[in-house]
A protein has these predicted regions:
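Surface-exposed short loop/turn segments
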Residues: 34-52, 125-178
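Short secondary-structure boundary motifs at beta->alpha junctions and helix caps
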Residues: 97-104, 176-219
């Protein structure tokens, strides 16, 4: 009798164990699929101008000449900045290493975001052209603004404090006899504090740094009467 009960209990135990094992596998698989399906947060510089009206600003003197039309070339960037990752550095540990946030992405490459923001600002006061746009016959060759994005990251001085750091090399050139003549060049380096030690704080700081850099570039171009 005991042997018979044992023979009946053994298959039942094995069946129960297999059922529990399958439930465990299904649960773990579901958790893994849920974790892998979490999409990273997508960031840009915000909606930009919300009105077509010019912002209130000091009027230009009547005798001031019109600003030259300007070609804004595609911004060149180092290979590390060609992707969409939101990058940071730990200056207190290894400042030479760029690291990406796992769950944060730019909506497009940083160089494209910077160019878009630059055109939005400069276009308020002058005619902007794209590379390859034609100009009227007899007109002087338009000036070209070239930019190289060398740094665009959140730099942590400590685990709790950081800044958005942007570094741009800006060059103004003009076509001359099938070549380009450099008219002016400068380096623009801007940093703005991050309000929080995370990707969202870094994005806001880099947006502020970009806007400040663009203001600096615009003011510089006007001092050159370009």
């Amino acid at each position: 009798m005991t042997n018979a009960m044992h023979l009946i209990a053994t298959p039942a135990y094995k069946t129960c164990a297999r059922g529990l094992f399958l439930i465990l596998i299904i649960t773990l698989t579901g958790c893994a699929l849920k974790a892998s399906s979490v999409s990273p947060s997508l960031y840009d510089f915000g909606p930009g101008r919300l009105s077509s009206r010019a912002e209130a600003a000091p009027a230009r003197a009547p005798q001031a000449p019109a600003l030259h039309p300007l070609i804004v070339a595609d911004i060149e960037a180092s290979p590390a900045l060609e992707g969409n990752a939101v990058l940071y550095r730990l200056a207190y540990a290894d400042a030479q290493q760029l690291k990406p946030y796992a769950q944060a992405r730019w909506s497009m490459a940083p160089a494209q975001l910077v160019r878009q923001r630059l055109r939005e600002h400069l276009g308020q006061s002058r005619t902007l052209l794209n590379p390859g746009d034609s100009v009227g016959q007899g007109s002087a060759a338009p000036l070209t603004l070239r930019l190289e994005l060398e740094e665009f990251s959140q730099l942590f001085d400590t685990p709790a404090t950081s800044v958005g750091l942007l570094r741009l090399r800006v060059t103004v050139v003009q076509a001359h006899n099938a070549s380009e003549q450099t008219l002016a060049q400068r380096m623009v380096v801007v940093q703005r504090p991050a309000a929080s030690a995370d990707a969202a704080g870094g994005v806001r700081a880099l947006t502020a740094a970009t806007d400040a850099a663009i203001q600096e570039i615009d003011a510089w171009l006007q001092t050159l009467a370009l």
